[in-house]
Regions:
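Nucleotide-sugar donor-binding catalytic core of glycosyltransferases
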Residues: 2-175, 179, 186, 190-201
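Soluble or luminal CAZymes and related metallo-dependent hydrolases
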Residues: 97-101, 139-142, 212, 223, ...
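Conserved catalytic or regulatory cores that recognize and/or transform ribose-phosphate-containing ligands
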Residues: 188, 198, 206, 210, ...
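A charged, aromatic-enriched C-terminal amphipathic alpha-helix characteristic of glycosyltransferases
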Residues: 222-252
Length: 254
């Protein structure tokens, strides 16, 4: 299961023997990059066939009480949040980490009254200087229950993607975002090409630049309850394990 589309394929394309041999051991390969191996992305796949999938979610484990911030008539105290890594330690020869994209949106807190909270292992001082509230990512993700609690106390997700996902139009969609949606939390996330495969506009919104991000925040806050309901419905329709696993097994056993 490839959760880092483009990074994985680009590393294979470099032809490092042990890495290529590792993937040759498998009968079927799956990826979270919905555009990998299609004309929508120029990432090379070589002799490998990658099957598109989303991360299966057990919805009962993510049901939550209404989000902080109350009804959609006001901003309320709830925060748009995410859990993120500024730069990954793997694939250092590929590059294209999240920091490259995030700096494009670093002044977002000054463009909206909406509060933000980042759980991040990155330059917290720099981010706080630009108006982001920050906590240590490890502190909120040591256990599945702490991770879930952080998401449940959030109003919505604001998520930026790694530069490699965006630049190569991979169609990557985050399993973290799935958890927000399954919790009934709307998600405003950067477009990597996933909008060709998933609904966008209610509950799940895409952005590609700061103006679109601000507009998305305003749309969610203008009718929060509707977006929260739509978020949960998208999770049921597209990420429910009872729907995804049969197809995974069918492809794996074919």
């Amino acid at each position: 299961m490839d959760s880092d589309p483009a990074f994985t394929q680009l590393a294979i394309a470099k032809g490092v023997p042990w890495y290529v041999e590792f993937f040759q051991r498998f009968d079927r390969l799956f990826t979270f990059g919905a555009n990998i191996g299609t004309q929508a992305s120029d990432i090379p796949v070589g002799a490998f066939t990658w099957h598109k999938t989303w991360q299966p979610i057990t919805l009962d484990d993510w049901r939550a009480a209404p989000a902080p911030g109350g009804p959609s008539t006001s901003l309320g105290p709830g925060r748009f949040s995410t859990v993120m890594t500024w730069q990954i330690e793997s694939f250092t020869d590929v590059g294209g980490n999240k920091d490259i994209e995030f700096v494009k949106f670093i002044d977002l807190p000054s463009q909206t009254r909406q509060p933000f909270e980042l759980a991040i292992n990155g330059p917290q001082k720099l981010l706080r200087e630009h108006g982001w509230e920050t906590v240590d990512a490890m502190k909120v993700s040591r256990t599945p229950w702490e991770y879930r609690e952080f998401i449940h106390r959030s109003k919505a997700e604001f998520g930026v993607a790694k530069h490699t996902y965006v630049a190569n139009h991979t169609g990557w969609f985050s399993d973290r975002t799935e958890c927000y949606l399954a919790s009934g939390r709307p998600a405003l996330v950067q477009d990597t090409g996933w909008t060709a495969h998933l609904p966008s506009g209610e509950g799940l919104l895409a952005f590609s630049n700061p103006d679109e991000a601000v507009a998305g925040i305003e749309r969610i806050n203008a009718d929060y309850d509707r977006h929260a309901r739509s978020a949960a419905e998208i999770a049921r329709e597209h990420f429910d394990a009872s729907r995804l696993l049969p197809r995974l097994l069918e492809i794996s056993c074919s």
